[in-house]
Each structure stands twice: as C-alpha cells, then as structure tokens.
C-alpha cells in the first residue's frame, strides 16, 4: 500500500502559507486579524481566534517545498468552516471554508499534489461538531427537529453533552441512524463525498477517535471506525484511514477499522520519563507515568514494548 513507509507532513492551514487571494477575504466577527509575522498568542484568550489567513492556495504554492524535504503525504487539519482558527468546531461538513478558498481551492490543491506525486488526507471530527453547525442549530431548543437525535440533548434540547464539557463542541449521538447515513455510511455521506471526484482525497484522519461514540452506557467506538472504513473501502478502495488515540489502540488496527493510528503515548510517555528531572517541578511528572528518570536504552526498550502491542 502507498502509505507503508510514507512520510506524513501535517499542515495547519491558517499558519502554513498565505496566498495573495487571502487579502480580499472578509474576516468573520470572531476572528482577531494578525499580520503574518505577528507574535502568536500562545495560550489563554484569543488563542483560537487569532487569524493569520493561511489558505489552501498558499499550500499549493509550496508543494515543491514538501517534496524537497521528503514528504509523501500532505495531511490537512480541518478545512471545513468553523468558529476558530483550528476549525475542529465545524459549522458544516458539506463545504470547504471560503476563508481557505472554498471547494475549488481544495480540488486544485489535490490535483496539483497528485501531479507531484503527493497524497492528500483530510481531518474529520466524528466525535463532535461545532455549536454553530447546521445540524446542531436545527435541533437546539427544538426537540421535534429531525436532527434532535444527532446529539445528546437534555431539558428540552437546551442542555447537551460535549467534548470534555466544552460548550462549543457538542458530542454526536451515534444511536442515530440518520446521522450515520448523512455522515459516515454510504456513497452519499460526508466521509464519501470528499474522497470521490471532483475532490479525490486519499484518506481521512479521525480526530479523537478514542472518544468517538463513547459516553456513559453507549459504546459505539469500535463500530464507528468499522463503518467509516467500510464506506471508504466502498467508494475509494485505495484510501487510507488513521485514527487519533491517546492510549492503547491495538484492537482498532486488526484489519476492519483503522489502518494506522496516532498513538502519542507510545512515544511521549517513555520520552517524558527520559527527560524527567526529579529536582524540577516539570509538568511531565504529573501524568501518571512515574517520576523516576530512565536512561536512553530504557527509553528505547519502553518504546519498543508499546509498539510491539500492535499487530
């Protein structure tokens, strides 16, 4: 498969490169306009609202750079419209954010990347949408809406469950067969749309895959990965599916679901222990991996043990 041994380069569109076309786009009210070389707000208020204006055309203009440094896969963080610079709070899954150049810009980027021998992957939040999403707005405070069972609403659809309690990220309820139909199941779904012509993405990375479909007594976690994979195999048999997991994901890569994972802990936890200095109050020591420093040889041993869990 083309993904074996590939070098994946992740791009956060707002930060990577800005084309001249971006100068003519009107910013939404939530955006804090920043000049390209301005200092970045590292944390706190304004972090998700600072807007530098990178776009898909800007990425297209720098594909030769990706080739030069050895990348073979371009992975785009979400390109759907949202209420933040990261766009993990999608307001629609049916269009590319006009601030990035719209649908035509994605089509052009993928075509140009393919011509240069690069694959292109997108990023989907199957765990949640944004609170400005068309489905959520249709159902909020409206229990009779067809989209009402797309989310975990309570109290006349005035309250709802969200990702880590963040109100702007309402959590999907995968009990809903209509949600499955619109989003992940079949050739008319969101998953399928962007893999097919005229866009031709080569695969998806599923955000917080470890939490998707899982809340209280509901656990559709493994099933949702299988449904997404089935749709992808149906519409684009050569496509590739990656899931984001913060813990052990070995049972999700057994052939019927994710083909690869972002399992940060396999790398970060041994590294944190290697870097740990008991004389300093470092954040790395607060994550439950122990505060005993280890040698480089032990780092490699731990990493191999984690990696060996996967088939």
Q: What name fits each language-model region?
A:
Residues 213-221:
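Short, flexible/disordered intra-domain loops and linkers
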Residues 207-214, 307-311:
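Active-site clefts of carbohydrate-active enzymes
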Residues 75, 121, 205-207, 242:
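Conserved beta-strand positions in the central sheet of alpha/beta enzyme cores
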Residues 125-126, 209-212, 246:
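Catalytic metal-binding/acid-base residues of hydrolase active sites
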Residues 132, 136-137, 229-234, 238-311:
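Conserved alpha/beta catalytic core and glycan-binding cleft of carbohydrate-active enzymes
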Residues 77, 96, 207-209:
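Conserved residues at the C-terminal ends of beta-strands
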Residues 6-8, 12-72, 79-198, 228-234, ...:
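Substrate-binding/active-site clefts of carbohydrate-active enzymes
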């Amino acid at each position: 498969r083309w993904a074996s041994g590939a070098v994946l380069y992740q791009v956060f569109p707002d930060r990577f490169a800005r084309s001249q076309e971006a100068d003519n786009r009107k910013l939404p009210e939530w955006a804090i306009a920043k000049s390209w070389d301005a200092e970045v707000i590292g944390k706190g208020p304004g972090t998700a609202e600072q807007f530098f204006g990178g776009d898909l055309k800007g990425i297209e203009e720098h594909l030769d750079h990706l080739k030069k440094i050895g990348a073979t896969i371009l992975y785009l963080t979400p390109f759907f419209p949202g209420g933040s610079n990261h766009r993990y709070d999608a307001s629609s899954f049916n269009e590319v954010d006009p601030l990035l150049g719209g649908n035509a810009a994605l089509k052009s980027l993928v075509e140009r990347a393919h011509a240069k021998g690069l694959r292109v992957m997108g990023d989907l939040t199957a765990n949640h949408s944004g609170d400005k999403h068309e489905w959520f707005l249709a159902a909020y405070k409206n229990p009779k809406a067809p989209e009402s069972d797309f989310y975990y609403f309570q109290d006349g659809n005035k309250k709802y469950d969200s990702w880590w309690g963040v109100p702007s990220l309402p959590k999907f309820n995968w009990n809903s067969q209509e949600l499955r139909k619109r989003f992940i199941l079949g050739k008319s779904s969101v998953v399928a749309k962007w893999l097919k012509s005229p866009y031709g993405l080569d695969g998806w990375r599923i955000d917080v895959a470890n939490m998707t479909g899982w809340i209280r007594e509901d656990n559709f976690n493994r099933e949702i990965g299988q449904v997404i994979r089935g749709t992808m195999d149906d519409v684009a048999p050569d496509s590739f599916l990656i899931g984001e997991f913060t813990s052990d994901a070995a049972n999700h890569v057994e052939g019927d679901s994710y083909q690869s994972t972002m399992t940060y802990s396999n790398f970060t936890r041994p590294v944190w222990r290697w870097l740990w200095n008991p004389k300093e109050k470092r954040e790395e020591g607060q994550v439950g991996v122990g505060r005993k420093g280890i040698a480089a040889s032990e780092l490699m041993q731990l990493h191999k043990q984690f990696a060996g869990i996967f088939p």
